[in-house]
Amino acid sequence: MKQHHYMKYLFVLLLFLPTCLMAQNKEEKMPGHITKIQKLEDVNVTGNRPHFIRLKGYYRSYQTNDSVMKYFNDGIVEYYINLKNGKTDLNAYSKRNLHNSRLVSEDKKRAFMVSDEGTFRPWPEGKTLIEQYRKKYQLKDSLGSQLVLLNQQTIGSIQTDSSRNICQIEINQLPTYKNLTHQLFGYTQTDIYDHVVETYQISPEDYYSFKDLLFQKSDNSYLFSHKKDKQQQLIHVITELYITEKEYVEKKQSIKQDSSTPKESAAAITDFCNRNKIPSLPEATEQEMQQLTPYNPANMKEIKE
């Protein structure tokens, strides 16, 4: 997971939780969303000499500004992870890009514009959270889990469920940042929350590799404003990735241009989520999403059907 995206790629969240947020309660269990993750079918091997792992899944990323939904993006994705160097290639299709046209129209036009959009498509590449934090921070065994410590402060936990062959890491990344406030072209962003979860299928080789990823979630909040604004906006972004298929393959499929209309993409996404039992959005969030309009992220213009 890349640590800090700059102003254009900012992420966000709803509530600011205490810094010591995990594994403090002796009765604590693995979070509820874990139980909703579907176990992958037996992994197929295509060809005699596989060079890639193909992961297929669904992602969604949505943003609110002062508790009003402004952006929603989701879609079906295939990641090809090179078994030799770990590099990832993406094949995305049935993408859906929605925005709140009223809020977007109210954005003040300035000579130097910095977009407040923080939604993004997950990109599993590089080091996993477990790899990063095992090397950088102290780990302490505690009640069947490991606590992640920074200067004796609990910032996360690593838990395993051997009965389901699952490992999960949760981290509050905010205490690891050197600077919480960033400025660019008169805009100021102040991070107030950054919580990340990664869940893996445990494997005999390397249970914290991205090739064993089942679920990934980032949940972030920041304050955002221009120096001429009278008040700051509270921006909140949640991004989730659910892996539904895993296969060893010899070569990547060629990336095809996605020419689906918004209606076609919505129908394909709904069918995929139903078949793979992807957890539904909260009802209120779903209703807000239904009020948004399709747009082209290349030029931010609305798409008429």
Regions found by a protein language model. Give the residues of each.
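Surface-exposed, low-complexity/disordered segments
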Residues: 25-305
